[in-house]
């Protein structure tokens, strides 16, 4: 599923197509261990866990998952997924760039108060949606519609790993309108969050620190080394996260 750029942990791939940057993914395994390595990308990722036991890490914060739920990965966030027990585990994801929902010709409140703030990082998607939350069912319904438009029959086998994209304009219209519906549900439930002031700096420090460790894993590493590498005392804190 991934191609990584070792020096930055940024994923090198086109999600969807250049004209329609949106894709559907399914990843499954029966074996305990790492399933998706640490990486980041500029797109939003909506993860759906239908069951199984996972550990999702986002910016070095761990989330243990053992029941049906959604998780959102905001643009630029470092994340990975591991499976906690042997057995059948499957996760699905819709990955899309916010640019596909943006319009330079319609600077209405949707653009100025929602789309652009997500693009510039001043607000962000909620981290998680659980079954007991009012927004869960409408988001799940919309998510399943997107999955089916992408060709849901291709993903019926429990442990099939794959990617679906589309060049069909009618399918693209359905997908785009359904993504906007998900945003509307989140907005109606006041689930978009104001980004913490030090959020971007902390993420970049974590990325730089992990990059240093990755590039120097064969050598003995002292805390002062990545701190010096990042030119920031914040790296010291990141190593203890």
Predicted regions span which residues?
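Short acidic-glycine-tyrosine-enriched beta hairpin
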Residues: 60-72
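A hydrophobic/aromatic-rich effector-binding and dimerization subdomain
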Residues: 2-27, 78, 82-159
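Short, Lys/Arg-enriched, Trp-marked, Pro/Gly-tolerant hinge/linker segments that flank
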Residues: 125-137, 150-225
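Conserved short histidine dyad/triad with adjacent acidic residue
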Residues: 24-40
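A cytosolic small-molecule/anion-sensing beta-strand core signal
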Residues: 50, 66, 75
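Short hydrophobic/aromatic patch on the recognition helix
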Residues: 68, 237-238
